[in-house]
């Protein structure tokens, strides 16, 4: 179990909250997280790259020049892979890059990744509570009050973010908003800082406890 210090939106300390998630053993955690990240990135690939083989390229019915007497190497088709505009040997074809990983391992990898970032977590009691309308500058100033630099990549995790917060964060390049029940290993590891709403911590423990 880990105890996190909670902050208010104005940056002042407000109390403490516990985060208790089961993690993988040290001997296997690195491999588990690595496989989870590979799976996530592989599954994002569209797999639509496609090239034409010799049989698919248009043309090539006639012999480009006679067999003998030119002094050049013999050629039987203008669509041979040896010529510009010819077919591609062993080029990419549409395929699925999806990798499998069972649900139990995925959950364990996510919990392990999150608990490994405990020192970078900012638990906020009332994230964006003063926002009455979408305003990017208010979010930027609020993150600064939490001790986060403008150059840092930030992952904001909230239980049920309002449209006002979504629109306010949407225009900030290095800040990403994600719902507490839609966490993923890559975003957790890719961010420099994690800002988690107090209600989101409860949601995380409810959803990912097992």
UniProtKB/Swiss-Prot annotation:
SUPFAM superfamilies named among the record's database cross-references: Ribosomal protein L4
Molecular function GO labels: rRNA binding; structural constituent of ribosome
Extent of Polar residues compositional bias: 44-54
GO cellular component: ribonucleoprotein complex; ribosome
A matching Pfam family: Ribosomal_L4
Coiled coil: none
A Gene Ontology BP annotation from the UniProt entry: translation
Record-stated family: Belongs to the universal ribosomal protein uL4 family.
Stated role: One of the primary rRNA binding proteins, this protein initially binds near the 5'-end of the 23S rRNA. It is important during the early stages of 50S assembly. It makes multiple contacts with different domains of the 23S rRNA in the assembled 50S subunit and ribosome.
NCBIfam families in UniProt: rplD_bact
Protein name per its UniProtKB record: Large ribosomal subunit protein uL4
Organism of this sequence: Prochlorococcus marinus (strain MIT 9301)
Gene behind this protein: rplD
């Amino acid at each position: 179990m880990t105890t996190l210090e909670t902050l208010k939106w104005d940056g002042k300390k407000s109390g403490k909250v516990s985060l208790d998630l089961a993690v993988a053993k040290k001997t296997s955690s690195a491999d588990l997280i690595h496989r989870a990240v590979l799976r996530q990135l592989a599954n994002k690939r569209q797999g639509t790259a496609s090239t034409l083989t010799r049989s698919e390229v248009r043309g090539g019915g006639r012999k480009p020049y006679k067999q003998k007497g030119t002094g050049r190497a013999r050629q039987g088709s203008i669509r041979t892979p040896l010529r510009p505009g010819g077919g591609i040997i062993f080029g990419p074809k549409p395929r699925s890059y999806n990798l499998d990983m069972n649900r139990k391992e995925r959950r364990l990898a996510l919990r392990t990744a999150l608990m490994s970032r405990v020192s970078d977590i900012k638990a906020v009691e009332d994230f964006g509570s003063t926002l009455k309308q979408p305003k990017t500058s208010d979010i930027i100033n609020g993150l600064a009050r939490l001790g986060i630099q403008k150059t840092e990549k930030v992952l904001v995790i909230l239980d049920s973010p309002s449209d006002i917060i979504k629109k306010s964060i949407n225009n900030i390049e290095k800040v990403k908003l994600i719902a507490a029940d839609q966490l993923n290993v890559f975003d957790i590891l890719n961010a420099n800082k994690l800002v988690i709403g107090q209600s989101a911590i409860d949601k995380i423990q409810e959803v990912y406890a097992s």
